[in-house]
Regions:
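Glycine- and acidic-residue-biased ligand/ion/polar-headgroup-sensing regions
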Residues: 17-30, 34, 139-156
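Short, solvent-exposed loop/turn positions at domain surfaces
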Residues: 10-11, 18, 34, 42, ...
Length: 192
């Protein structure tokens, strides 16, 4: 999403069953939810459960750019709905993957064992030379938006060059691997 200075919406979400995740990549969002105002700078993250009644405006002089991931919430009897969560990636320590010397890490805004959440948006980071050293698959479809850097990504046995601004949508069980050759780090926003 791109919002010009002075733009925004007093009612961006019209579906009362939709949950949303906002992730700011440029500018500053003024988010109002539950009568509280939050300023989301780059790296800012907001989880908004269904019927949150939020507003979002760009009160800054710079263009606001953010990702808005929406999904109908799947209720499960006996499990409470998630709470609103406002944070910034800089406030969360990345978790290094085992046996990677810290060259492959994931920043998790919500822990995967929190069953209240039926979708997740994380940041995956590879330092130069970092790899997914094996073909992996996932049971669910998922999307990747490249935030920074360049890499080659194995998608269903085809090696594809990807860079900042690229988007990939992977079907369930699509074999994948990655090599981030550098010179800088490679990062992507992961939705699943």
């Amino acid at each position: 999403m791109e919002v010009q200075p002075g733009g925004g919406s007093d009612r961006p979400e019209l579906d009362p069953e939709a949950q949303g995740i906002l992730f700011v990549v440029k500018g500053t969002a003024t988010l109002r939810v539950n009568k509280q105002i939050h300023k989301l700078a780059p790296g800012g993250y907001a989880y908004l459960p269904p019927s949150s009644g939020w507003t979002l405006h760009n009160t800054d002089k710079e263009v606001l750019c953010f990702h808005w991931v929406r999904k109908a919430y799947d209720r499960v009897e006996g499990i409470d709905r998630p709470d609103i969560l406002i944070t910034n990636e800089n406030d969360i320590a990345p978790t290094a993957m085992p046996d990677t010397d810290g060259k492959w890490a994931t920043t998790r805004f919500v822990e995967p064992d929190d069953l209240r959440h039926d979708m997740h948006v994380n940041i995956v980071t590879f330092e130069a030379g970092g790899v997914i050293p094996f073909l992996e698959t996932h049971v669910m479809e998922h999307g990747l938006y490249v935030l920074e850097g360049k890499a080659v990504y194995n998608l269903n046995n085809d090696w594809v060059e990807v860079e900042a601004g690229d988007f990939m949508w992977l079907r369930a069980f699509c074999p994948q691997a990655c090599y981030a050759g550098g010179p800088g780090r490679f990062r992507y926003l992961l939705y699943k």
